[in-house]
Amino acid sequence: FDLSKRSWIKCGGVIKTFIKPRSVKEINYVLLYLNQKNINYYIIGNISNTIIRDGEINTPFINLNSLSKIKKLNNKNGLHIYSDSGVSIPVFSKYVINQGYSGTQGLYGIPGSIGGGIFMNASSFKNYLTQNIRKIIVIDSNQKMKIVRKKEANFSWRNSIFQSHKSIILGAYFYFPI
């Protein structure tokens, strides 16, 4: 898998093992195998804010872009939605706007994914992806699914708890008030 042809900034080497699971169940199978074999791995999404070295790369990469559903939960007192981590931020932003809500218009130009945006607390024009987040669904370092509440995520400028704790962000619940 040639990263220089897929990354946002058109650089990076050739990944020998590129894994693109289509479901949480498949992610768990992949993690079980890699952990049993004591193989390190990288999680990637849109490869838009990541610089990866040139040359051949032996470490497996797990791409979560196939987790790409947005689900409207209800409209009671505002818009409640769930987004998978592989949804692109522009698609997410447009979805919220098309539902008649604001708060994401400044995010439209960010080329990343929801998972990466949560990981780094992405923002643009004073719109933070995480400002309307309620909870995040992750697979923790023990391979258990876990809910992380917004307060627990310790969001700050370009930072979150996920940068210091090995978790895989699967998706998040958002609320946009009327």
Regions found by a protein language model. Give the residues of each.
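Structural signature of FAD isoalloxazine-binding scaffolds in flavoprotein oxidoreductases
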Residues: 12, 19-24, 51-69, 119-149, ...
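Hydrophobic transmembrane signal anchors and adjacent membrane-proximal interface regions, especially
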Residues: 32, 172-174
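Low-complexity, flexible helical/coil segments
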Residues: 77-83, 99, 118-120, 141-145, ...
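Short beta-strand or tight-loop elements
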Residues: 102, 132, 153
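Oxyanion-binding "anion nests"
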Residues: 176-178
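Flexible, small-/acidic-enriched active-site or ligand-binding loops
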Residues: 152-161
